[in-house]
Amino acid sequence: MEQYRGTTILSVRRGNKVVIGGDGQVSLGNTIMKGNACKVRRLYKNQVIAGFAGGTADAFTLFERFEAKLEAHDGQLVRAAVELAKDWRTDRALRRLEALLAVANKDASLIVTGNGDVIQPENDLIAIGSGGAFAQSAARALLENTELEARDIVEKSLGIAGDVCVYTNHHFTIEELSF
């Protein structure tokens, strides 16, 4: 059975801000099932922002597990991500989940993968999902050649991804942390 999937999630850190944004399209195979899904949210007392790409039900399971890890480790992002990754590798049910998480707080931006990896990307730029490569290319160009704020870079880059990726639309959810 096919899963609901297809999205673009982008995280940009610049100055004293980190922003994660995502589109709202949910696809089942070649069909758009929903256009206004919220794939980005705030976690742990509004100190962490997170976005997901991949199977929708799988991602919600991961959100719940990740939030529980944040609570258990007093909001320590890296520790919570590593503990979730450990569970992901050892738990039979979790190993079958097909999703990626992009998570960030004032100190770090991380990708938690379906293989149980925790990756801190270069330049604190994260792009995941079907339109991730398009959004990442646009964001890198804007980071290197403009003085735009992080939120503006996310908006413009998601817009470009939405123009070229059939699994990405222009209904964005964007969350921002200032520190």
From Swiss-Prot:
Q: Which GO terms describe its molecular function?
A: metal ion binding; threonine-type endopeptidase activity
InterPro entries associated with the record: ATP-dep_Prtase_HsIV_su, Ntn_hydrolases_N, Proteasome_sua/b, Proteasome_suB-type
Q: What is its EC number?
A: 3.4.25.2
Subcellular localization(s) per the UniProt record = Cytoplasm
Write out the function statement from the record: Protease subunit of a proteasome-like degradation complex believed to be a general protein degrading machinery.
Catalyzed chemical reaction(s) = ATP-dependent cleavage of peptide bonds with broad specificity
Instruction: Output the Pfam families linked to this UniProt entry.
Output: Proteasome
Name of the protein in question: ATP-dependent protease subunit HslV
Q: How is its activity regulated?
A: Allosterically activated by HslU binding.
Residues annotated to bind Na(+): 162, 165, 168
Q: Does the keyword Cytoplasm apply?
A: yes
